[in-house]
A protein has these predicted regions:
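Core nucleotide-handling region used for phosphoryl-transfer chemistry
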Residues: 11-60, 65-393
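Proteolytic processing junctions in secreted/extracellular precursors
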Residues: 3-12
């Protein structure tokens, strides 16, 4: 089958770009999607444990997760309108298409002034740090002088704030001077090589490329991780208990079939309100959620179909509540094991002061890249942690 030259150019551009992937919570959600994904997640968690110990592991790099917005993609890709490689920017990956000029931005994002403005700034200044040889990178917009989200503060500090967390550094430090003189601040985290992704990229070559662009320092101070024998024992205790609870599941895949998305939504609810996950709590959440599906349809036949589905799902939870109990126990112990590692990463010392509503805060989390190309995020999923505060903001 033949294709037009323009279609070929669109496909060529797509081959070097890709939608910004959702990062899964390490030890937080994969067990709701079956035995195989749970086992892979356990393996990733154990290798982060080895990384923290300084042992050989499959972890390639750990970076600090930046609380910026919007997520973008930029680089030199083929412009279908000209047939040449040009610098362009895309919102949340290339799925919405690249903008190569202001006309493109107007057409794609003219109805969203805030987003249009930020992507326009990335388009204007991003090219100053990206050569055609740098390929395509993904990142987050951390602030700008134009939007007044890069600003000086008392105490001789320079700060950025786009989302929940405010980042602050001494104005007379090397990075502080760069931020003070910049027009925009960007956090770069991923480089694309065809359909391959390189996470937690080395951003050193971008940092001094242009005074107009400040590159957010998202490097982990690995040498400062103080992972003591006591911490290691606490991790191992909860890791072992989680595996024991998984071992009590008679049919892991069958248990979560049809429930995966609801379980994940329920866990977010418990993060938001600080409650402990339980079969009873899940059943209540599920009933309330499915009742909405029943209520919003009009015809008797459709309403009865939705009602039958709800009754079946709730019966399933009640009939297997002992198995859901083991699943939630495993979830709880995995979260505790993960939090031991998270605490050590958080205490390794950050490159910026983090505050939320002028109160000292910890980082949003960390991004862990593995040598097989997989990636996970490590985040405090308590009501008091970043996830809880972000869900409740």
């Amino acid at each position: 089958m033949s294709i037009t030259f323009t279609s070929f150019l669109f496909e060529a551009a797509a081959a070097t770009t890709g939608a910004i992937k959702h990062l899964t919570h390490l030890a937080g959600e994969e067990h709701f999607y079956g035995k195989e994904r749970a086992a892979a997640d356990l393996d990733r968690l154990e290798h982060l444990h080895r990384f923290a110990k300084g042992e050989k592991s499959y972890v390639s790099r750990v970076g600090i997760k930046a609380d910026g917005s919007p997520a973008f993609e930029m680089g030199h890709v083929v412009n279908p309108a000209t047939g040449h490689k040009e610098f362009g920017v895309a919102y949340k990956g290339a799925s919405k298409g690249y903008a190569f000029n202001q006309k493109d931005l107007d057409e794609k994002f003219g109805d969203k002034p805030g987003l249009h403005s930020k992507l326009s700034q990335v388009l204007e200044h991003g090219k100053k740090v990206m050569s055609p040889l740098d390929g395509v990178v993904q990142g987050d917009f951390m602030g700008s002088k134009k939007d007044k989200t890069v600003f000086p503060e008392k105490g001789n500090r320079m700060s950025t704030k786009e989302q929940l967390i405010k980042y602050s550094i001494p104005a007379d430090s090397e990075e502080g001077k760069k931020l003070k003189n910049s027009k925009i601040s960007l956090a770069l985290h991923t480089r694309l090589h065809g359909d391959q992704r390189e996470y937690n990229i080395d951003t050193k070559k971008f940092e001094d490329a242009s005074p107009d662009v400040h590159i957010f320092n998202n490097k982990l101070n690995k040498e400062n991780i103080n992972y003591t024998p006591e911490h290691q024992a606490e991790f191992q205790k909860n890791f072992k208990k989680a595996k024991e609870e998984f071992g009590k599941l008679r049919d892991h895949d069958g248990l979560v079939e049809g429930h995966s998305e609801h379980l994940q939504t329920y866990i977010n609810k418990t993060v938001r309100d600080g409650s402990t996950p339980s079969p009873a709590g899940y059943k209540k959440h599920l009933g309330e959620r499915l009742q909405k599906d029943v209520d919003k349809v009009k015809t008797f036949a459709t309403k009865q179909k939705k009602q039958d589905h709800m009754d079946s799902m709730l019966h399933d939870v009640e009939e297997h509540k002992d198995q859901f109990h083991h699943l939630f126990n495993a979830h709880r112990h995995l979260d505790k094991a993960k939090n031991v590692l998270l605490d050590r990463l958080e205490m390794s010392g950050q490159n910026q002061e983090h505050t939320i509503n002028d109160k000292q805060a910890k980082p949003e989390g960390f991004v862990v890249g593995y040598k097989d190309g997989s990636v996970s995020k490590v985040v405090n999923r308590s009501k008091e942690g970043f996830s809880g505060q972000n869900l409740n903001k």
